């Protein structure tokens, strides 16, 4: 699976373990809830895709997991994330919790070493200074839009990115494919996009006009 390794190298993230699935799955790729980073590739990415299309899909997924430390792999829905947040805050500020958060609170407690607990206390204090409210939905949206930008940076072609998003089938944080493309279009022609592509060694031309990565194999 050389395309996965190439994309990971471009984005500066670890190369995950790779598994394949004969059936299809949403987005064609997903991280697995395993101890070490691991992805599974579905049928739609294993056949009939160009290299830039593969790079966008893979880059988007790898970036998302790096941004969240794979948090969304283990807690993919808003209710699950909210329960985790409540359980984490309860380590510092004890309070009555719903049953799902109680289980998480008790599981987290023995895993928090003193340094981590100090970081958590600092984060909770900062949250309280802002009124104690944290809206997770904008955070999920920001992660998704940033991940799509990373996929675009790797593949270098806005048309490819738009095409892959159109068939992705996932709605993340309420963002449709059109919402994500509307964010990517101005970014694709921005100075910051060109600067980042130069910094990661790709250049400003579409990937198919420079040195392409190897095909998926």
Model-predicted segments: where are they?
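Cytosolic-facing loops and C-terminal tails of multi-pass membrane proteins
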Residues: 1-2, 6, 18-28, 78-217
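Short secondary-structure junctions
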Residues: 9-15
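Non-catalytic alpha-helical coupling and interface elements of nucleotide-dependent molecular machines
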Residues: 13, 63, 67, 86-94
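Active-site scaffold of zinc-dependent metalloenzymes
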Residues: 21, 25-72
């Amino acid at each position: 699976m050389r395309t996965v390794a190439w994309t990971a190298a471009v984005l500066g993230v670890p190369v995950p373990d790779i598994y394949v699935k004969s059936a299809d799955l949403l987005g064609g790729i997903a991280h697995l809830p395993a101890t070490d980073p691991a992805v599974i590739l579905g049928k739609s990415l294993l056949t009939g895709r160009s290299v830039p299309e593969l790079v966008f899909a893979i880059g988007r997924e790898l970036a998302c997991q790096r941004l969240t430390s794979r948090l969304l792999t283990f807690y993919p829905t808003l209710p699950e994330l909210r329960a985790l947040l409540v359980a984490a805050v309860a380590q510092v500020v004890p309070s009555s919790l719903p049953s799902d958060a109680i289980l998480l609170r008790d599981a987290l407690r023995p895993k928090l070493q003193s340094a981590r607990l100090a970081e958590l206390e600092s984060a909770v204090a900062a949250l309280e200074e802002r009124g104690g409210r944290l809206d997770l939905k904008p955070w999920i949206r920001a992660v998704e839009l940033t991940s799509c930008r990373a996929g675009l940076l790797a593949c270098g072609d806005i048309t490819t990115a738009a095409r892959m998003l159109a068939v992705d089938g996932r709605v993340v944080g309420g963002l449709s494919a059109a919402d994500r493309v509307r964010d990517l279009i101005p970014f694709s022609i921005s100075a910051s996009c060109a600067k980042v592509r130069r910094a990661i060694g790709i250049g400003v031309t579409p990937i198919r006009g420079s040195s392409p990565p190897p095909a998926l194999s």
